[in-house]
């Protein structure tokens, strides 16, 4: 028998989450963001469940080609654009929409030999200060691009740094309005948080990512608990060992947990080599045989320990949900001082994945 840990992906939840995005932004088209191998879920596993989307957005050329090879004929947006001028040959071949955010890309587009014009997303820096042109340069750059034979349809895009806050986009929106002055253009501004909470930023295309997979852009499950969004990934395993501790006995590396009284603990086949966060402290929520309990002690490479006090019936082979439908990935991430995005993306290759 194989080691009992596995990740299961609920494709119906993925479809429902896309439907909820459409309800949240009924007048916009949807770029489903599948970067980082669909946030760790696997593009090849999940793309067809998102077949009702208007387009896919990602980073890697290899992932874009995978979508084309699997039969996706709709738009694909390359969120960081092309990294080298020679990439434009493949962008042309596979009909990819490219972000343009830097001066060197303008020259590369001008000089490229393309069979047909490429659609362009011109990125404005609205305060994130990662990629994009400053607002006072956008009109000039837009006009440069518009004059190029290699450029097809154009859209203005940006990315919000603080859309999870009620007033988090006001400054960015002001900079975007400055950038768009004098332009009649399509816009794509909204990430997951803005899609849910800032309808004034929806415009023509929204770009949901984390909410498609059923986690919160704020890192707090309670913020999306009433939206109908459902977790797509469940990471589960089983108890493979049971120990009964005496008062004062300790658990795991460094002995960081000490039993106050006699206590049963279960040893679960899951550790940081599987993608479970090593820094998850004692008290991180976990579900054992349908009962909510907690981890105890230090997470090891291949194992972790859980308190069996609330579930005395548990023993060898008892199922454990590490995150999923009941134990939200946001709650595990918050306990470990990180975000659900990271845990999804960190799922290890050695963990078997099934779709349901």
Swiss-Prot record:
GO cellular component: cytosol
Keyword Isomerase among record annotations: yes
Residues at the active site: 35 (proton acceptor), 253 (proton acceptor)
Top EC class for this record: isomerase
Annotated function: Isomerizes L-alanine to D-alanine which is then oxidized to pyruvate by DadA.
PANTHER family in alphabetical order: ALANINE RACEMASE, ALANINE RACEMASE, CATABOLIC-RELATED
Family: Belongs to the alanine racemase family.
Protein's name according to its UniProt entry: Alanine racemase, catabolic
The species this protein was found in: Escherichia coli O157:H7
């Amino acid at each position: 028998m194989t080691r009992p840990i596995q990740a299961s992906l609920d494709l119906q939840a993925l479809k429902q989450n896309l439907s909820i995005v459409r309800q949240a932004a009924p007048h916009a088209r949807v770029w489903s963001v599948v970067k980082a191998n669909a946030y760790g879920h696997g593009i090849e596993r999940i793309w067809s469940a998102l077949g009702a989307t208007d387009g896919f957005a990602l980073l890697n050329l290899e992932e874009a080609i995978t979508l084309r090879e699997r039969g996706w004929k709709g738009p694909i947006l390359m969120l960081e654009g092309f990294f080298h001028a020679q990439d434009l040959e493949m962008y042309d071949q596979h009909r990819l929409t490219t972000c343009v955010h830097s001066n060197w890309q303008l020259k590369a587009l001008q000089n490229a030999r393309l069979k047909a014009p490429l659609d362009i997303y011109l990125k404005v820096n609205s305060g994130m200060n990662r990629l994009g042109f400053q607002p006072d340069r956008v009109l000039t750059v837009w006009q440069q691009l518009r004059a190029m034979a290699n450029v097809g349809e154009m859209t203005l895009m940006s990315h919000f740094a603080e859309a999870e806050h009620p007033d988090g986009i006001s400054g960015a929106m002001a900079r975007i309005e400055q950038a768009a002055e004098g332009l009649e253009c399509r816009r794509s501004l909204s990430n997951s948080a803005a899609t849910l909470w800032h309808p004034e930023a929806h415009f023509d295309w929204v770009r949901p990512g984390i909410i498609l997979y059923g986690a919160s852009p704020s890192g707090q499950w309670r913020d999306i608990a009433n939206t109908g969004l459902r977790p797509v990934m469940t990471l589960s395993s089983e108890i493979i060992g049971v120990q009964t501790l005496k008062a004062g006995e300790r658990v795991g590396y460094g002995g960081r947990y000490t039993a106050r009284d006699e206590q049963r603990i279960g040893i679960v086949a899951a550790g940081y080599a599987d993608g479970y966060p090593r820094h998850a402290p004692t008290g991180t929520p976990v579900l054992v045989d349908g009962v909510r309990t907690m981890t105890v002690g230090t997470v090891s490479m291949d194992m972790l320990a859980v308190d069996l006090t609330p579930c005395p019936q548990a023993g060898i082979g008892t199922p454990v949900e590490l995150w999923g439908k009941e134990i939200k990935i946001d709650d595990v991430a918050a306990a470990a001082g990180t975000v659900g995005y990271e845990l999804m993306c960190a799922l290890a290759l050695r963990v078997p994945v099934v779709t349901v």
